[in-house]
Amino acid sequence: MKATQKKIIEHINLAKADGADLVVFAELAVCGYPPRDFLEFEEFISLCEDAGREIAEHCTGIACIVGLPVRNEELAGKDLYNAAYFIEDKQIKSIARKALLPNYDVFDEYRYFEPAREFACIDFKGVKIALTICEDLWNINNNPLYVSNPMDALIKENPDVMINIAASPFSYQHDDERRIVLADNAKKYNLPLLYVNQVGAQTEIIFDGGSMVFDQQGNMLDEMDYFKEQLKTYTLVGGAIEGKPTAHKPMSDIAQIHDALVMGIKDYFVKSGFSKAVLGLSGGIDSAIVCALACRALGPENVMAVLMPSKYSSDHSIKDALDLVANFGCKHEIISIAAAADAFDSMMAGAFKGLPFNLTEENIQARSRGIVVMAMSNKFGYILLNTSNKSECAVGYGTLYGDMCGAIGVIGDVYKTQIYELAHYINKDGEVIPENTIVKPPSAELRPGQKDSDSLPDYDTLDTILFQFIELKKTSKDIIAMGYEETLVRRIIKMVNGAEFKRYQTPPILRVSPKAFGSGRRMPIVGKYLA
C-alpha cells in the first residue's frame, strides 16, 4: 500500500505540473481491487485511511478523486462502503459511495460493502460532477440487474459532467461491451463522460486499463492505452470535453490475450517479490507458449526452462525444446527423469506384481517431473509456472502433483485451439516457436506412441463443446441439438464435472475469458447434476 500511495502522489504532482485542476484515480486505487478479506482486518482499513490522509496532504493547487474503502458510521448494515474521496486544498470535501455492488463471477462485493442509498454531485470550480463507481453505470441495458440506478438520482442535480472510476476486469471482447455501456450512458444523460479504469493484475484477475472519454452524444473522444499505466489531461469547457470523435483502436482477441498474460505474469512476480521463473519445457506447444510469455514478461535472463526427458521422449521433442531456448536466450537444464521413474517402478514392483503398465506408471513420470521443477524452485528461489491449458483443465487431462503443480496457471484459461493462435501471433515477426512444435500432433509422451487424440476428441470439436458448456452454460441437450454426437457430448460434460476435484487443487489461473476456472466458477465437487 505504501508503494501505491507513493505512485498516487507522484501522479498528483505530474498532473499538477501539467496544469491540471483535477486528477482522477481508479476504483479502490489506494488498496487495489479486489482486496478481498483484507477488508475484514481493522488495521487494513486504518492503513487505507492513513493513506487517504497522506494523499490529501499533497493536494494543494490541484484536486483529486481517489477510490478507497470507508467505514459505515451507521449501526445497521455492513461495516464498509466501496467509496471515493473528493479532495481539495488538503481537505476531504466529499465522499461518493458505490450503490450497485456486483456479486457475480469474480465479484463478491456484498460480502464486504454496504450499498449507497444517498447521492450528491460534487461542486468544483463552477462545475457540477456526477461521480459514480464502476457498476453504478452498468444498470442501463434492456435487462437491468438492479432495481435502482444512481445516475437517475444524480441527474436531478443537473450535473455538467459524469466521472466513473472503475476496476473492470479484462476478458477478451469485454472492452467492446464496456464502450457500448459508457456511450449509452453519455447519450442517455446528455453529458460528457470521463471513465478511469484500473490497470494491472491482482493475483489471477487482470485489469486492462483502456480509460475513455465520451462527449454528450456518446461519441468516443479518446481511448487510453490498454495494459499500460498512463496519465493524460483533458479540458472541460462550457460543459463539453474538448476533442473530436475518434475511432476505437481494435486489437484481435489473441493480441489482447497475449498482452494480458504478459502483464499478468509480470504483476504476479512484482507483487510477490520474486523476479525469476522456472517451468518444465517438453518440446510441446503449451510449455513453449508459457516460456515465450515468461521471457517477454520477465526477460529471458530470468527464465529457467527445465527439459526432463524420459525413455518415452522423442528426439524431436528435445530438439524443439532446445531450439526454443536458443531462440529466446533463456537459461535451461536437462535433467532426465528416467532413473527416478525406474526407481519408483522398482519400489512398487511388489505391490504391483502381475499388474500391467497403465495410467499409474504414466502419472509417476509426471509426478517425477513435478518433483524436479519444485526442487529447482525451492533451491534457487524460482516461481514455478504451470503450463496446463484450459482444455486440459476442463476435462482433467493432467496429473495432480505432477504437470498440474505450480504457483500460477499461465494458460489455464486459454483453450488449446487458442494456444495455436497464440503461437502464430508470437511468431508474426519471425519464428521463435519452432514450426515443428506447432504442427506435430500433441502428446504427453508418457507411453510409446502416445497422442492426445488417443484420449480426447480433436481439439476443434472439444473446445467448441467446452465453450458452449462452460462459457455459455448450455446443457447437453442444447449442444446435441447443434449437431454434436450425443455420446461424445455427454462424455465430455461428464469429464468436466468429474475433474472438479482436480481444479480445486490447481494454482490460480490468469483470467482472460468471461468464465475462467477459479473464483468466477464455483462448482461442488460431489454434486450429481450433469447438465
Regions found by a protein language model. Name each.
Residues 190, 216, 244-283, 287-531:
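ATP/NTP-dependent adenylation/nucleotidyl-transfer catalytic domains that generate, transfer
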Residues 1-280, 291-300, 332:
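Enzyme catalytic cores with a strong preference for nitrogen-chemistry domains
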